Design a protein with these regions (language model features):
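C-terminal regulatory/oligomerization modules of transcriptional regulators
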Residues: 1-3, 127-146
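N-terminal leader segment of winged-helix/HTH proteins
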Residues: 1-34
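Pre-recognition alpha-helix immediately N-terminal to the DNA-recognition helix
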Residues: 23, 42-45, 104
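Charged, amphipathic alpha-helical coiled-coil/dimerization segments
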Residues: 26, 74-137
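Short, locally clustered residues in the helix-turn-helix/winged-helix DNA-binding domain
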Residues: 45-49, 137
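Short capping segments at the starts of secondary-structure elements
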Residues: 50-54
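Residues within helix-turn-helix
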Residues: 55-56, 67, 74, 94
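The alpha-helix within a helix-turn-helix
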Residues: 59
């Protein structure tokens, strides 16, 4: 186990991220889900919660830049998880919506996410989790100031 300190904090965060992505890739494969990378999950989650969205709104909600979102949407569209639909009121605008294929994998994605979160916070009390979340929120605000 890594002892986290100021000198390896960013390394530790990256290591955690890589381990979680590897877990997600393994679980997606085990469930027979292909064409989705772990970094695409937030896009599908946002669309599931918010419904059909304009590309610009999806960009804002995902905190990713437009070129990244465009590439992710193209990938998800190619694999049948989302569709692009021109806005009925303004043909310049593109709406993104999940497909039936995305809806069918939702239960597996929720199960994978729940299992991962349960393991991630195993052994932490409610108070420890609250402290962790408060500290990470403060760190996130500090990063926003960079």
């Amino acid at each position: 186990m890594i002892r986290v300190h100021r000198g390896n904090f960013l390394y530790t965060l990256n290591s955690i991220r890589q381990s979680l992505f590897a877990y997600l890739e393994s679980e997606l494969s085990r469930h027979g889900i292909s064409g989705i990378a772990p970094s695409h999950g937030d896009i599908l989650h946002i669309l599931d919660k918010k419904g059909t969205l304009h590309l610009r709104d999806l960009t804002e909600l995902s905190l990713k830049d437009k070129s990244t979102i465009t590439a992710v949407i193209s990938h998800l569209e190619k694999n049948g998880y989302v569709t692009r639909v021109r806005d009925g009121n303004d043909k310049r605008l593109v709406n993104i919506q999940v497909t039936e294929k995305a809806a069918t994998i939702k239960p597996a994605l929720e199960k994978i996410s729940e299992k991962m979160n349960t393991q991630l916070f195993e052994g932490l009390s409610a108070e420890e989790k609250n402290t962790l979340f408060k500290l990470m929120t403060r760190i996130s605000h500090n990063v926003d100031k960079l």
